Swiss-Prot record:
Listed name of the protein: Probable sphingosine-1-phosphate lyase
Requisite cofactors: pyridoxal 5'-phosphate
UniProt xrefs under Pfam families: Pyridoxal_deC (PF00282)
GO biological process, one term: sphingolipid catabolic process
UniProt EC number: 4.1.2.27
GO CC annotation terms, alphabetical: membrane
InterPro entries: GrpII_AminoAcid_Decarb, PyrdxlP-dep_de-COase, PyrdxlP-dep_Trfase, PyrdxlP-dep_Trfase_major, PyrdxlP-dep_Trfase_small
Signal sequence coordinates: none
Amino acid sequence: MFGFVSDLLTAAVSSLDELLQDTPAHQIILGTAALYFLYNQYHNPSISRWYRSRNNASMKQRIIDSAYALAKNLPGVNQIIEKELNKELSSTREKLRIQRSGMTLREEIPEEGLSPQDILSAFDVDVEKCHFDFLSVTNDSPEREFLVERGDGKDSGALYAIHPKELTELLKEVYGATALTNPLHDKWPRINAMQAEVIRWCQNLFHGSKECYGLLTHGGTTSIIEAMAAYVIRARAKGIDYPEIVVPETAHAAFKKAAELTGAILITVPVDKKTGAVNPKVMSSYITRNTAVIVGSAPSFMNGIHDPVSELGQLAKKKNVPFHVDACLGGFLTAFLDTSSEPMDFRVPGVTSISADLHKYGCCPKGTSVCLFSEDSPALSVYAALNWSGGLYATPGILDGSTSGARVAEVYATLSYYGKNKYQEIAKSIITLRNAIQKELTTLLEEGNGLTSEDIYVYGNPQWSILGFRSNTCNAHFIADELEKRGWKLNLLQNPDGFHLCLTHVHTLVKGFETQFIKDLREAVIDVKNYPPGKKPSGNVKVYGAVGMMPIELQREICKQYQKARLNYTSASPGSLRIFTNVPVEEDEGLRNRKTEKYKV
């Protein structure tokens, strides 16, 4: 038997030699490598996982990353990169220094407790900025003008509500009464019942059944992570070693974070270039036996465009996969509008979970969101460790253990105070303002005024609170930069370049908001069109342009250093940020000065 096999192999090798005798060596090597790669693509899970995850990066990005991986090992390259990055980040350090100038900062907790007056003085700067946030502002109130003067009327999606003074005082009392309670324990039955009430209210808003399950979380990112973790854990329990989360390319970055934290693979699906929404037929081609969940946005953060939830629900049912609707941004806006013709919640068969932020259009204190699961959801976000030596340990949610009951109580108080009718009034006023802005822009472009729809236009067909702007003749980031000079603080977008304006209740209180915005937008576009050829970008525009030509590793390092600077107050001092630990830097003068308990930045 072995002799027969040996003869067969010898004959096969001989035939292969004859077949390839005139073939150049490099072709044989490349062909062998290609066959080996293709084999592993389908039969080696680790290679398949690497390939599918890498496939999410553009070819341009992969080339940049590969070139950097080779170049960074060359002598002196790290030092050059370090030097250039510090030049680019110098403006960030300067902004931090200016923001914190005049603040009295401490190195340690005080030895003796401070008086309430001394403690409150530490908040003076931010309290002054929020002073008018706590007034009862009506359409005829003179305080409306202050919103513009303080810049609140020109921030995109930063301040979602202006609480009446009465509600602010109520929230103070509620927090003081409940700050030390903990919903994880049954010692506070009213807090526990209140949490169940809040979750039930939200389930009803999104048309869930009484058997729905829900969590009150710290924010949209947490809600998304809870849902994704539940589905990934379920997939692994089914024997799927490398679960995949399939999302539109416009899905929030929190899904990428969730994939990295759970060890799942994030599969991004291209959206339609005209509509900005994902095509269910295209998404279908990305679903495999490893798919843990598919995702749709309602709406997306970038351009405020919602994916076709009903069609995606049908796809989920057909493919027998869970379907998560991310309504973190607009959930508590659309819930109070008539969406019966195009539902985006549990009315859609196939929807198994929804994430929605209370701290946006729900007007609740920051750090509040919900993650809801349908009655038919195959997975729930629950954690249990029943063999722990400390006893039975179980939490409603995978991430949180103990939390303050004040969060529950403040959400309960806010929702109760506003009521459905007020939320409906707010939602309608925001949509009315969005329509007014679009009408003003249409009128501007029809009248000419030196501009056409090629110079500035709203992308897609947004129906809710976000307007995404692009230009075919100008750098959209330059336009946003000019608007910033006029006091506007907008969100820059990339791939492709653009910017968006996220409307909130605050904007509806600013008299003539739409007229002022379109006036400034027109001036900004005209200024950019008159830029001299070859004008170099600066500020945020320069940062966004550089990121597009930067390796992923450096992008993450810059973000890490920026966040480190924000969270470590000493980083506001002049000095070099260290990217590579083996690169020597000069001693930071600020470090030498931190010898006393207090100092001025």
